[in-house]
Swiss-Prot record:
Protein name: Protein HIRA
Keywords tagged on the record: Chromatin regulator, Coiled coil, Nucleus, Repeat, Repressor, Transcription, Transcription regulation, WD repeat
Gene3D superfamilies, alphabetized: YVTN repeat-like/Quinoprotein amine dehydrogenase (2.130.10.10)
Compositionally biased spans, kind Basic and acidic residues: 1007-1024
GO annotations of cellular component type: nucleolus; nucleus; rDNA protrusion
Subunit composition and interactions: Component of the HIRA complex made of UBN1, UBN2, ASF1A, CABIN1 and HIRA. Binds to histone H3.3, UBN1, UBN2 and ASF1A. Interacts with AS1.
Location in the cell: Nucleus; Nucleus, Nucleolus
Segments of skewed composition (Polar residues): 421-437
WD repeat placement: 10-50, 64-103, 123-162, 165-204, 214-256, 279-329, 333-374, 570-609, 649-687, 689-727, 745-790, 869-910
Family: Belongs to the WD repeat HIR1 family.
Organism the protein comes from: Arabidopsis thaliana
Role, per record: Histone chaperone involved in maintining knox genes silencing throughout leaf development. Involved in heterochromatic and euchromatic gene silencing, especially upon salt stress. Involved in gene expression reprogramming during dedifferentiation probably by modifying histone H3.3 recruitment at the nucleolus. Contributes to maintenance of silencing of pericentromeric repeats and certain transposons.
Amino acid sequence: MIAEKPFWVKHEGLQIFSIDVQPNGERFATGGGDHKVRIWNMKSVDKDLQNIDTKERLLATLRDHFGSVNCVRWAKNSRYVASGSDDQVIQIHERKPGSGTTEFGSGEAPDVENWKAVMTLRGHTADVVDLNWSPDDSMLASGSLDNTVHIWNMRTGMCTTVLRGHLSLVKGVTWDPIGSFIASQSDDKTVIIWRTSDWGMAHRTDGHWAKSLGSTFFRRLGWSPCGHFLTTTHGFQKPKHSAPVLERGEWSVAYDFLGHSAPIIVVRFNHSMFKRIPSSTHETKQVGWSNGTSKSGEKDLQSYNVIAMGSQDRTITVWTTGSARPLFVAKHFFGQSVVDLSWSPDGYSLFACSLDGTVAMIHFDPKELGVRLTDTELDELKKSRYGDVRGRQANLVESPAQLLLETASTKQAGSKRAASDVQQNQVTTKPSVSVESTAKRRKSQVDDRNKAAESTGQTLNKASTLNRVSSPVNQKVYRRPDGRKRIIPEAVGVPQQENNIMINGESHNFLPASAAAPAKGDSGDFPVEISNRDLSGKEIVCRNPDLKERSRITARATITESLVIEKVPGTSGRDGVLNVEQSVGIKESSSTDLLIRVFDWKDGEAAPPVCLEACPREHALDTVGAVSTSMVKETEISCKKSGETLWSDRIMGRVTVLAGNPNFWAAGCEDGSLQVYTKCGRRAMPTMMMGSAATFIDCDDSWKLLLVTRKGSLYVWDLFNRKCVLHDSLSSLVSSDVNLSSTVKGTIKVISVKLSKSGSPLVVLATRHAFLFDTSLMCWLRVADDCFPASNFSSSWNLGSAPCGELAGLQVDVRKYMARKPGWNRITDDGTQTRAHLESQLASSLALESPNEYRQCLLAYVRFLAREADESRLREVCESFLGPPTGMAEAASSDTNLSWDPYVLGVKKHKLLRNDILPAMASNRKVQRLLNEFIDLLSEYEDVETADPAPKGSTPTMNCGGVPSSLDQIGSDPPAMTATTPMTIDNDKPVSLENPAALDIGVCEKTGSEDRDKQDQNSRDSGS
């Protein structure tokens, strides 16, 4: 026996939590407190090869974790290495061709080998402390401090199931070498045996750990290579600590390994079984077989297991199942607890690591351990006991369709993962509406933007570099009862960036624009930028709160103010009973200019934008006979294109908000008035009085205008038909939570009000809760909130990537806001919150009429139900997409209450069922009978149903909420309506100047001229 401690195996002087030897014997990996996984050359510690080049000792350093690496485990095929960390993430690394790299500024030499992360497994809500691969490497089990064990499908990277049953921290997990069971051990002093056939609980044992004392980092239990014994940790049999051994089948404790003076942290069986070398009794006694009492003969041919144990008493013991005493005891090797062990592939070398940051290797001789059984002999032994175990852990396929859909499900998951990677690595350029102080042509705008980027490049690069720095990390430090330090990284919020970037970007299609002037208040908000100028021409940058406006870029030209609404006690919440204040980041100034810019692509792609500017003016007014003069405040509104003034007007008072599109312009004033202009600058209607100053304004790409006043009144008008579509108050959003303080209760702060893509009003509060008004239900729907912090899908909204949809943008805002809160952290979920979160997201995407996000949420929801084997909810989902029973369609269609729409958001439900839902259900064979049932039903429907016409792509003229009866196809945009192409014209009411049902914006004149032409033609015909 040879023992050594290589001094160069270290993690920058920090603790080493895990060690594992590659099954092919070429490398071994360690994980430590420096957040890194290090891969070492096995030849550097080989007892026969001591003269290896020192540069080839450390082969690679993996730096993808952001917390201490608690566990590293090699796959059986030696291709992958898995690592679990305090950052709640599991990384799977694979060696790639080429040479390695190094971290910039680390001072370390470049890696000899190139190892890259090929898969990241997210789902745990606390530290991942133990990992174990299945016998065929198809699955990975992970134990975590969130009290759960996750089972991962390594073909797709998806979580197959979550095993819940422990009441405290899960600190050890191991896979049965036969593949039929998984065992886990927890701080609740229990060991649970799980079946892999249906992931149910086979047995719970809790008696032999009830008297255990103290606490340990890990409880790493181990299964014998023959599959018959399960050795656990942290047992206690007075007066010594023990390792109870469970026997397969009855799962009762057969015996204990007794002798350590402190809790046992880790046990590790040798990969192989051994036989004794035939020898004399004298030689046998020297190696300690059964305390020297064994006899030569048949017992020499019996195979036995070898097991190593590491304890908190800083010692290592090696035992055999044929002896009541340890074969080997290693003392004074380490200064702290032994936390992990690993055997070499040949079975004669033991690797150990300790919390003191060192590693030890112990090389045994065949005379000490015995003769190792070959792999063939071990397989024959298992086959004689359990039969052919290949594929035993898998459920049998009951139909060919199951295999086809499993293949489709794998491709579906792979494409989703690839799309996610592309989204994280790309910066998507999206159309925008800009606000700036000039109206140059596009080419000059691009040139100006490039010049501005060059002049501010150094500042921006510095800011972006600061934002990318991952350390130092905000941490919370406390000490456990045993004196050990516990460090928990806190969630890092998004920094408040001081971006002074002017918006000169290109816009690829028409979008409306809106802007607002600043008002008095505090400076605690996070405003977005609009461009303002004082009378001297110097440009002022104002930042305003709403982070995701319809322009869909970070720096937008939209509403600037936040609105605080407080309900007066004892009132009903109507207009006039609201206490209101406003708050923004800068003081009110009478010299603030407003400017919006609108692109109209009817004039060509290279056409310059049309700019509307509101400039406050003050001048003295001399009154005849009066001694003194008075100052008159008014606002000059001018519309320009390519530097040429198209029209101008003057309004008494100060303009606070502007909005416009190619059909109309609107200006709201602080005295509560609203003026609407035609695109040519004519006043389309008398001044509208709202009763209080306008604070938020928005418009769509046709004739819809939204306005919110300082009193909290919300209006939505159809200007083309001169009617109010919606008049409601934001007071219904005032919280009445009894748990809130008296200063907060009955008060809301609104930071954004806009028209959603579905045409419904969308309100975002300072808490980042988002509300959508549904005119069908006549109430507000909360489509984004922070009610599901424990959901496994709460972290799926990437805070750094560009959101791919309206709902995703709202959820990212919620996550950013929650990350800013001190002490915010994820909590454990029992599955209920995750399911409720997905159901809420599914309903919200439907209300927002976001087809792509609806499909994504639907797939995630079905996969979750399939993973949980929730057949009742899966059946309900499938039935809702399948439709009424075959042959009942006519009866159902005659009754409007039983009518069934075959389309959802423009997509045929049967297509979603066939292409998305059923393949997602195929991920778990436990529900394959339900899957086959709906495959047959769908085939029957497709045989008897007639071809349904495709849904019309027209968008309803006015729709402020709910799901319209006529929906667009996925990805299509509603057609932009112009002044000469109204959406609807009532033929019973001729459009003329006397008809108040039509807005006088160019349509009346055209229609009147057409009528006169027809009258002239009729008179000529009668005359002839």
